């Protein structure tokens, strides 16, 4: 009897795996198929003439990795609005509206973390500390605790590193903002552009514990620390409450090739093969045409999606989006002398 059940489970799994058609990730056929489905979102071309290895490397998060301790639930104690956008709630915190570019490196796990940490540092200091926390510092200096740099990592390790070792400031590539700006250049998704071509060959830069020339204070003095870091349960209300009270969070989910074509609307997987795990920053929620969504920021530059942002189905743990939420609270006492 139990052999029959196992066989049935396998058959169902195989059937499910083939429910959705498969297309080349960069094909017009994939885009056209999605747009003919009368689904909740629209597809378009975000990438031209890039290596498939590059597309897969963009998805550099190891799903199901180490877990941080959970925080005490408080979602039932908060009256939550139907729609929320952290960019509007904390309009004095400019990093919330920023879109970064991870380049040819599987560093999404680091970007999702430093973006949310930057936002929360501003939020928890009432707008007094506006800092772009360095993805470079986290990517290159966290080590094995965070995974394998450009070859993929763990969001939980990123937040733990922030609380234990701290992170310096650092803006986007060639910005000369902060102690350690990002050293991996953006690459060209489009045919006629000035950026270098996108490949899957990016190596992890080495850890450099000194700020770029002309910047002060020193690397050690520039560190920003977290007071605590934790995981948030997959309860929709708890995730919403966390964002509403403390600011954007880092989330991770399984990317399928149709996500690469997202342009607008509420993303729901329709077609294509699995590309890998991907980390992003979730900054709000809402309802569009009756469909509940999470509002999120990607790290594939402004050319991708809806000016770098996207919406994804909320409430069904779609592609695992509600399974791996991590966050933390900044150590604000380190700034007291500055106010």
From Swiss-Prot:
Cysteines engaged in disulfide bonds, as pairs: 93-122, 105-150, 141-207, 142-146, 179-211, 187-198
GO cellular component, one term: peptidase inhibitor complex
Record propeptide residues: 18-79, 334-339
GO molecular function: collagen binding; cysteine-type endopeptidase activity; cysteine-type peptidase activity; endopeptidase activity; proteoglycan binding
Organism: Mus musculus
Taxonomic lineage: Eukaryota, Metazoa, Chordata, Craniata, Vertebrata
Keywords: Acetylation, Cell membrane, Disulfide bond, Glycoprotein, Hydrolase, Lysosome, Membrane, Protease, Secreted, Signal, Thiol protease, Zymogen
EC number: 3.4.22.1
The reaction(s) this protein catalyses: Hydrolysis of proteins with broad specificity for peptide bonds. Preferentially cleaves -Arg-Arg-|-Xaa bonds in small molecule substrates (thus differing from cathepsin L). In addition to being an endopeptidase, shows peptidyl-dipeptidase activity, liberating C-terminal dipeptides
Glycosylation sites: 192
Protein's membrane topology: Peripheral membrane protein
Protein name, per record: Cathepsin B
């Amino acid at each position: 009897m139990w052999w029959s059940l196992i066989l049935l489970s396998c058959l169902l799994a195989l059937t499910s795996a083939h429910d959705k058609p498969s297309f080349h990730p960069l094909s017009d056929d994939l885009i056209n198929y999605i747009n003919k489905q009368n689904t909740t979102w629209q597809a378009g071309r975000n990438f031209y003439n890039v290596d498939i290895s590059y597309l897969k490397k963009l998805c550099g998060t190891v799903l199901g990795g180490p877990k941080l301790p959970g925080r005490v639930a408080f979602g039932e104690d908060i009256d939550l609005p139907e729609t929320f956008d952290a960019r509007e709630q904390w309009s004095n915190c400019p990093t919330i509206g920023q879109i970064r570019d991870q380049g040819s490196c599987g560093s999404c796990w680091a970007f999702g973390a430093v973006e949310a940490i930057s936002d929360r540092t501003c939020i928890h200091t009432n707008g007094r500390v506006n800092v772009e926390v360095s993805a470079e510092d986290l990517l290159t200096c966290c080590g094995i605790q965070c995974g394998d740099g450009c070859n993929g990592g763990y969001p939980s390790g990123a937040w733990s590193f922030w609380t234990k070792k701290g992170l310096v400031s650092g803006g986007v590539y060639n910005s000369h903002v902060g102690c350690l700006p990002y050293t991996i250049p953006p690459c060209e998704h489009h045919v006629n552009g000035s950026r270098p071509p996108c490949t899957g060959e990016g190596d992890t830069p080495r850890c450099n514990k000194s700020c770029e020339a002309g910047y002060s204070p020193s690397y050690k003095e520039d560190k920003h620390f977290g007071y605590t870091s934790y995981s948030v349960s997959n309860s929709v209300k708890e995730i919403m409450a966390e964002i509403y009270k403390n600011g954007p969070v880092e989330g991770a989910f399984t990317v399928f090739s149709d996500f690469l074509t997202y342009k607008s609307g509420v993303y729901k997987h329709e077609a294509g093969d699995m590309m890998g795990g991907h980390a992003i920053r979730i900054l709000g929620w809402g309802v569009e045409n009756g469909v509940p969504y999470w509002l999120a920021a990607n790290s594939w530059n402004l050319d991708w999606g809806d000016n770098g942002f996207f919406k994804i189905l909320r409430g069904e743990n779609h592609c695992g989006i509600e399974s791996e939420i991590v966050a933390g609270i900044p150590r604000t006492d380190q700034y007291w002398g500055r106010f």
